[in-house]
Amino acid sequence: MAHYNFKKITVVPSAKDFIDLTLSKTQRKTPTVIHKHYQIHRIRHFYMRKVKFTQQNYHDRLSQILTDFPKLDDIHPFYADLMNILYDKDHYKLALGQINIAKNLVDNVAKDYVRLMKYGDSLYRCKQLKRAALGRMCTVIKRQKQSLEYLEQVRQHLSRLPTIDPNTRTLLLCGYPNVGKSSFINKVTRADVDVQPYAFTTKSLFVGHMDYKYLRWQVVDTPGILDHPLEDRNTIEMQAITALAHLRAAVLYVMDLSEQCGHGLREQLELFQNIRPLFINKPLIVVANKCDVKRIAELSEDDQKIFTDLQSEGFPVIETSTLTEEGVIKVKTEACDRLLAHRVETKMKGNKVNEVLNRLHLAIPTRRDDKERPPFIPEGVVARRKRMETEESRKKRERDLELEMGDDYILDLQKYWDLMNLSEKHDKIPEIWEGHNIADYIDPAIMKKLEELEKEEELRTAAGEYDSVSESEDEEMLEIRQLAKQIREKKKLKILESKEKNTQGPRMPRTAKKVQRTVLEKEMRSLGVDMDDKDDAHYAVQARRSRSITRKRKREDSAPPSSVARSGSCSRTPRDVSGLRDVKMVKKAKTMMKNAQKKMNRLGKKGEADRHVFDMKPKHLLSGKRKAGKKDRR
């Protein structure tokens, strides 16, 4: 099926936008910093890359344009002729040809300047070669200004064309302007074509879709056609001629019985005879429209003879009225049936059908005598069929039960389960429990094993295996157990005391704590230590012991005094109050010190989760190049 979608063609930029886009992309996607003290091969590569990158961008965009636009020789003749009428085939091909030439010129310019750049001996010379190469490429594109603008207009118009499938089932409406073609398509499809009481309201092709016999149909509304030579017809009329020539459709030739369109029945008949060659090998129906104003029976004899002659030639004439919808469905049905029959007949005449038919052979046996041999059906089968026709089925289905019980019905599929024990049908045992398959843990002989275990236990109980009394423990073991019990109770008390304190600050180590003598003696007694001889204990002896008597210093001769008189030394002023004149100033200094310590205290409680790494290099300030007028950012 030839199906074309011209809405996917990419936008064709103007020459100025084309150049700006490409050069901007080159500046963004290639390095921008080079210095003259770099090695010459690095400088050459820097500018070669810019030239090649620009050439590749031009090449890709131009190739995309050439690929997206349809080739007139490859598409369906209907679209080829329609594009020739709307856009002029020669102009269209010239524009695409110029784009193709521009693409080749850009490639050649890049190739030449890359070759010259290999011999550049300085940064300045390589830069000038790059500048010349990009300039020549832009000049080539600038000369394609008119071609690019023309192709953009063609693209916009193509995207607005209706999607017409030339090979599907189609009904085609044609006739003089203002005879009711657009009103008919609005009635049979969901199209919304503008209808006005003047000629040439429809200036292009319109498509509507409908369903008939579960098939999809398209109805094409063509602009009105006037009766004059083909060379004198304008673009609007030629669209209708193109559709008639190329679309394999059922043609509905619409005539105005009331002659309100401004053309008599004779003129409409002459137009019919003029375009009759376009109706060859197509089902044709003459639609006599506006029968609500005037019917065929009310016409003069000469006008009635027009429709009589058409019917005698094999063209059905159907009276319709799009205002009252009389005959509209009849026309639709007749046209669709004729087109379906015509398509089947055409396929039967084709080679493809003959190839299939040649492979098929219908074997018909020849009669050997005149004796009748009807098919044999056993009497039991015949009787069963009669019972099935008269009697109801014995087994009730779930649907029958649902209808009988109504709201009380509950779907129960477990009653059909085929189990060994029928009472287990409704046991609620899951198939999967906590990721384990229940079937893996079910032993079919589990009840038998349980009975064996119960018998074994009864035998053991009868033998008195469980009647033996445990041996009495000795005194040493009882003391150990009692001591262990006291230790466990002591641990529990310690835990409770610790919970009551609930200290959250730093804890002082046990060796640094001051131990009171009474507390120590109490703890030792609770642990079972005999404290009767506590006065001779080590800690009591150490407490009573006085300081060792030092050896008396030998008296020395007095030296003559270095000074006549010396006043007694005074104590040094504390640092936290030195330099402060009064109490008020001391309080103020302490307040300032406390406020300064707040931040440090907060950071002191900071954990690993409170860490934050600040962005020391914000990209929006440090990315890009420092151009003129941008240096105040950093």
UniProtKB/Swiss-Prot annotation:
Could you state one GO biological process linked to this protein? protein stabilization
Say which domain of life the source belongs to: Eukaryota
Cross-linked residues, Glycyl lysine isopeptide (Lys-Gly) (interchain with G-Cter in SUMO2): K103, K332, K534
Q: Cross-referenced Pfam families, in alphabetical order? A: NOG1, NOG1_N, NOGCT
Q: Which organism is it from?
A: Homo sapiens
Q: Where is this region: Disordered?
A: 495-517, 529-634
Q: Which positions does the record annotate as the modified residue Phosphoserine?
A: S122, S468, S470, S472, S558
Question: What segments bear the compositional bias annotation Basic residues?
Answer: 544-554, 586-604, 619-634
What protein name does the entry list?
GTP-binding protein 4
Q: Which PANTHER family match?
A: NUCLEOLAR GTP-BINDING PROTEIN 1
Question: What UniProt keywords apply to this chain's record, in alphabetical order?
Answer: Acetylation, GTP-binding, Isopeptide bond, Nucleotide-binding, Nucleus, Phosphoprotein, Ribosome biogenesis, Ubl conjugation
Q: Where is the OBG-type G domain?
A: 169-340
Where is there biased composition of kind Basic and acidic residues? Answer: 573-585, 605-618
Report the family membership: Belongs to the TRAFAC class OBG-HflX-like GTPase superfamily. OBG GTPase family. NOG subfamily.
Instruction: Kindly list the organism's lineage.
Output: Eukaryota, Metazoa, Chordata, Craniata, Vertebrata
Annotated localization: Nucleus, Nucleolus
Spans of biased composition, class Polar residues?
A: 560-572
Q: Where does GTP bind?
A: 175-182, 221-225, 289-292
